């Protein structure tokens, strides 16, 4: 979430439409199950934000994956997906997705059932089966199975491509970086490496050429992009509402009271210029619209001090 907020404003400079999403890991059982024999083989799933509701749900899922489901990797489960599917579009993911993995295992009916379950969660236009061709040995079998599921269920197809680098010629550079990361050499035959140089950002023409019999699957990339309309309101403060004590209906009046009490306690008999400075600082806070913020900070700082919790200086 932090990175997408950082990059989001720059998309207008390049006249591009940002699609906010995440590849998540889905636990094969429950996110709280952590028995290696059963729970190490998690599934991949792509989640894209249609709108602000979807963004909030994605943020919740991402947080829960780390705080509740972390086992080897941060994981969610289908229970969480059922509760937080609104505003999201799901894609079946790469060979590590649940549907492709069941197809590779020869369990066509299981793959079909998993796809139907996802469609039930995300809606008729909220779940897509990904056709990919990275020139990997298993690609044809997976694609044939996905096309069959599409024909029998009507779940739409979409042409996608895993992108680990920008251009095809960058494959060697990425391979070298992986060696550096894992402390291996490029001539080590047993090291982890990508099995193809097709994991780059392909043009629309290249993707269409890979699946000439399924033009609608290529067109669905545009359809999905049109369904995703997430925007951020930068420069607008979204503070929680501060609950005022009994007898106050105006935060500004309560802010004034606290400042006056604190000033009298710290500076009894202070000269006039001190009071002028207080009025100036309070005016700036009001002008910036930060009265509620200062009340909130004052509240939790006071709570900490009353309970002996150390409080550091503000920055």
Identify the residue ranges that each predicted region occupies:
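Short, well-ordered junction/capping motifs at the entry into regular secondary structure
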Residues: 1-3
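Phosphodiester-processing cores and adjacent nucleic acid-binding clamps
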Residues: 7, 11-315
């Amino acid at each position: 979430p932090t990175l997408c907020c950082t990059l989001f404003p720059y998309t207008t400079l390049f006249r591009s439409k940002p699609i906010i999403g995440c590849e998540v890991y889905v636990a094969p059982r429950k996110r709280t199950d952590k028995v290696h024999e059963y729970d190490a083989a998690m599934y991949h799933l792509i989640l894209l934000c249609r709108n602000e509701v979807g963004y909030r749900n994605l943020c919740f899922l991402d947080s829960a994956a780390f705080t509740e489901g972390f086992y080897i990797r941060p994981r969610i489960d289908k229970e969480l997906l059922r509760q937080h599917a609104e505003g999201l579009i799901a894609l079946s993911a790469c060979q590590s997705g649940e549907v492709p993995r069941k197809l590779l295992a020869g369990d066509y009916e299981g793959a079909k059932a998993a796809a139907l379950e996802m469609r039930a969660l995300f809606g008729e236009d909220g779940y897509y089966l990904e056709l990919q061709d990275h020139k990997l040995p298993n690609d044809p079998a997976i694609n044939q199975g996905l096309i069959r599921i599409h024909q029998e269920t009507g779940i739409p197809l979409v042409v996608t491509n895993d992108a680990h680098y920008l251009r095809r010629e960058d494959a060697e550079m990425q391979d070298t970086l992986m060696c550096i990361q894992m402390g291996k050499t490029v001539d080590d035959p047993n090291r982890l490496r990508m099995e193809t140089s097709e994991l780059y950002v392909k043009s629309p023409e290249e993707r269409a050429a890979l699946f000439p019999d399924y033009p609608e699957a290529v067109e669905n990339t545009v359809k999905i992009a049109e369904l995703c309309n997430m925007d951020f309101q930068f420069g607008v403060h979204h503070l929680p509402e501060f609950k005022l004590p009994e007898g106050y209906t105006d935060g500004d009046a309560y802010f004034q009271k606290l400042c006056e009490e604190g000033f009298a306690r710290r500076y009894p008999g202070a000269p006039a210029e001190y009071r002028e400075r207080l009025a100036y600082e309070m005016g700036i806070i009001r002008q910036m619209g930060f009265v509620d913020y200062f009340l909130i900070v004052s509240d939790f700082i006071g709570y900490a001090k009353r309970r002996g919790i150390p409080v550091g200086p503000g920055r």
